[in-house]
């Protein structure tokens, strides 16, 4: 783990804060784009995701890595629980500064002062209750914060916002991803072998120019990348013209 001087960190923060101030709360981006879920301080896995080579590139040509050419959306939770939170946040902030139009960095609950203070260096996992059938939203008594939601709530939210798919993070999934509510909601979790204790895969979602969705799975310890092409029903296809993302993910149910 490298060390950072106070001057380096303050300079990095000042530069990225100025960029964030200039951006709208509701960010819009056109595909193709890669969506990354929770990282939680797992720096090596973050680097591995960013260093994937462009799929269309000739094997004999000079490697062109995705971190400098692709568009990325991060759903938050870059820090806490892992051992290299500082490295992770410094890397994504540096990429935002170098490629401001290619990176959208959303704020997860672990990017709030209270949560960061509480979980910064502790190992903690929480098992939530099963999602109920009724009512659509109820208080999450198991975790003591936020709410639980069901399929009816997802359908109503999509109808009100006129959207076809909600992509969220904030929850470990054994396969790295999971669809819900007839594929109108997908949870993405990008930290394989979470906290070096759970035998889960990591995943990222890729949205092609035509709106087609694929999921890249990263396993641990061999870190083999495997592509699953998910054929979405026509009414579940993403609008390929633009994607809208909230910069304050804490307003979403989790």
Swiss-Prot record:
Q: Which organism is it from?
A: Caenorhabditis elegans
Q: Which PANTHER family match?
A: SERINE/THREONINE PROTEIN PHOSPHATASE, SERINE_THREONINE-PROTEIN PHOSPHATASE
Q: Which InterPro entries match?
A: Calcineurin-like_PHP_ApaH, Metallo-depent_PP-like, PP1_catalytic_subunit, Ser/Thr-sp_prot-phosphatase
Report which superkingdom the organism of origin falls in: Eukaryota
The terms under GO molecular function for this entry are: protein serine/threonine phosphatase activity
CDD domains, from UniProt?
MPP_PPP_family (cd00144)
UniProt xrefs under PROSITE patterns:
SER_THR_PHOSPHATASE
The record's GO CC annotations read: cytoplasm; nucleus
Name the UniProt record assigns to this protein: Uncharacterized protein F44B9.9
């Amino acid at each position: 783990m490298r060390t950072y001087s106070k001057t380096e960190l303050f300079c990095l923060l000042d530069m990225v804060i100025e960029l964030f101030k200039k951006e709208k709360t509701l960010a819009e981006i056109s595909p193709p784009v890669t969506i990354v879920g929770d990282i939680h301080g797992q720096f090596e896995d973050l680097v591995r995701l960013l260093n994937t080579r462009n799929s269309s590139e000739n094997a004999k040509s000079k490697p062109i890595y995705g971190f400098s050419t692709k568009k990325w959306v991060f759903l938050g939770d870059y820090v806490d629980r892992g051992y290299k939170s500082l490295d992770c946040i410094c890397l994504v902030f540096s990429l935002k500064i170098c490629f401001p139009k290619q990176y959208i960095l959303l704020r997860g609950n672990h990017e709030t002062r209270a949560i960061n203070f509480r979980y910064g260096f502790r190992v903690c996992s929480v098992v939530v209750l099963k999602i109920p059938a009724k009512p659509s939203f109820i208080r999450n008594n198991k975790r003591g914060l936020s709410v639980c939601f069901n399929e009816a709530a997802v359908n109503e939210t999509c109808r009100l916002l006129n959207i076809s798919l909600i992509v969220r993070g904030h929850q470990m999934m054994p396969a790295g991803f999971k669809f819900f509510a007839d594929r109108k909601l997908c949870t993405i979790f990008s930290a394989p072998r979470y906290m070096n204790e759970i035998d889960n895969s990591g995943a990222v979602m890729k949205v092609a120019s035509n709106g087609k969705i694929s999921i890249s799975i990263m396993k641990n310890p061999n870190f083999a990348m495997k592509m699953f092409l998910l054929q979405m029903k026509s009414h579940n296809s993403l609008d390929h013209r633009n994607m809208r993302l909230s910069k304050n993910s804490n307003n979403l149910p989790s």
